[in-house]
Structure formats: C-alpha cells, structure tokens
C-alpha cells in the first residue's frame, strides 16, 4: 500500500515538472510504441461509425422516410455528441487519469453501437447517434494525450499525424464490408442495422487490447502519484525517475480556468493553438460537407451507376478514392521531418482547395471523369491537412492540461463537422451541387492562409510551460 506524504507544494510541483521535462526528451520503448498504436486505432472505430452510415443513408431513408432536416440530424448527431464527449472526456482524463477514461468510453461505445440495430424510428436513431458520439469524442481527446505522453519526441508527432491513415483504413474497411453485404442480396432494412451495429466488433477487440496498458507516467506525475509514475516510467522509457521521492504527494487538481491563461501566456503556444483550432474547423467541415456525401454525389452525378440502377460501380469508385486517401494518410507523417508541420498543412489545404474547385466545375458541366479526379485531389489534400491539427493542439499544451487541450481541439473538428453534415444538403438544394462545392472550397483556402501566416514551425517541439 502506497503512503502519501505532504511536502512543500511548490517543491513537489518543481519535482514533477523536472521529471516531466526529462521524460519528454526521452527515447521510448516498444511498450510506449504499442500504447501509441492502441490509442490511434480509435480512429478506425470512428471512421467505421461515421462512414458506414453514409453508405446506408439511402436505405434508412426508404425505411423511415425522414425529412431533409431529420436526415441531416441523423448524420450530424454523432458529431454533436463527439463535441460534448471531447470536452468532458478531456477534463475527466486530466483529473482522474487516462486509463479509467479510455476503458469506460470503449464499453459505452460497444453498448450504444449494438443498440443502433434495434431502433424503431428516425428519432430513436438520431438520439442514439448523439449518444454514441460522446464516447468517440472522449476517446479521441484522451487518446491524443496518451500518445503525447507515452512516446518519444518526433515519434509522438508522427503517431499523432497517422490519424488520417487510420481513418482511411476504417473507411475502406466499411466500404468493402457493406458492399459485400449488398452484393449478397441482404435485405436492405437488415443491412443498414447490421452495418451500424458492426462497429462494436473492432471496439471490443480494441478494449481487450487496452486492458493491459498502463497509465501514462506524466499523468501520474501531475496527480502526485510518484510511486506508480516511477514504475511506469521504467516500463515505457527505461528511466526510474530517481529525482522523485518514493512516496506519493498531494498536488492540486488542474483548474479548467487556468487552461487558456497558460496557453495565451506563451506566443508559440498561442499561435499554434489558434492554428490548430482553425485547421480542425476547416478540415472538419471540408470533409463532412463534401467527402462524407461523396457516395451520394457520385450516384446523383451518374458516376458508376449501371443502366439497371445498381450502385455497385459507385461503391467501387468510392473505395478506390479512399484507398488513395489512405496512402496519402500514410505518407503525411513521413513528410514531417522533411517539410515540417507548416509544409504538410499548406500542401494539404492547397490541394484540397484545387480539388474542390475542379470538382465544382466538373459537376457543373457533367464531366464525370473530372468529378472523380477532383475527388482524388481533394482526398489526397484532405488527408494531409487533417493530419496534424490534433497533434499540434496536444503537443504544445502542458501535461496537466493536455487532454483538455486535445478535447478543445477536437471540439472544433466536431462542431464544424456537425455544421457541414447538416448544412451541405440544404446548401445543395439552394445553390446546387456545384455551388455548394465552390462554397466548401472557401474553407480549404482559409486553412491554407492560416498555415501560411499563423502557424510557427513546431516539428521537434518540446513543451515547457511559461508562467502566465
């Protein structure tokens, strides 16, 4: 049983900060790499849940005959739930630790995913989609904090920037599985229910894989749990942190009111955080306003649709586009040592802007091949511009606020995604598909300008807190 002693609070904080700086500059072990992969794998589950519904919307519409607003809510509700989860999960993880939160969120997601198969009407589905977003948002904010605290400098940035690669894998996996169910002739009313509930399978696998993961030593340090922090530090970083006493100490809990004050006190943190919020908002709306509805856009434009009305060809075209996007997501982290975070963001948003403009003109003139080309350029760019916003928001934050910072950053992704998913169908009705596409391109341009004029180069950055 660990004993807790009371030392001078300022001295305890200095010891904790010294140990934190030591670990942030350490090389990780195979255990820390395993933990990073376990956390970033959450994106596979989110991608399945987010994109599976895009492929079965047409079947949900047939069963429930929803209004345009209800259909928009059914797709956007998960984003609203994730917004709530990102805020709550980040705060809870900073106060109570990473492991308790990431175990709890996976259990909740599994239960809610299965429940989707049994909804009776569109409002049941909307409510469940809202609720299922809460554990998703919570797990992302907590997972990014875990990655930044359990991996070595450079490696943690690359792992964090792999989220688009994992997102692409999840999307391609969902496309393949749903297409196979469609080809087998499964009843469409059953198909969409099974598709949504299947998200529980990878979530259960991930839950069991995480059970043996330790709490991060940095999170333990910030809560005064020095005995456990020394043990876990030895496991993850091969450093027993000899500067710390062998007793736990009492440390004050982090205050949410101090978070922005600390971020704003440092010009590097401030500029990086502002960029991360802008980038997350632009890429979140950019994706859900156009790429999320890509299957619908392709069907309505006649791309891949057979004379008999089969959408199998459309699904295959979409799968190929997302296979390309997955390659882009894999390449983006590899480019960080070469062109840095600014370069990745500028190239990403620039290509996304060009792809959307080209896609808009192609839709306007019914150039089917150019619609596909524009979508490919957009998705390659998007998987670069979306790769590092969450990483930047997390890496510049002090450890005691890191999950909170990740949560705040993810709020901008999900608020923009909710807006994009809900508004794009209405915008398409008002301006047409081409006009709506041109409107979305403005977001990519804003992201490019933010990367050019706001973002300082951060590759290799090691956080050091300045007093407000």
Describe the function of each predicted region:
Residues 2-468:
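Transmembrane-helix signature of 12-pass secondary carriers
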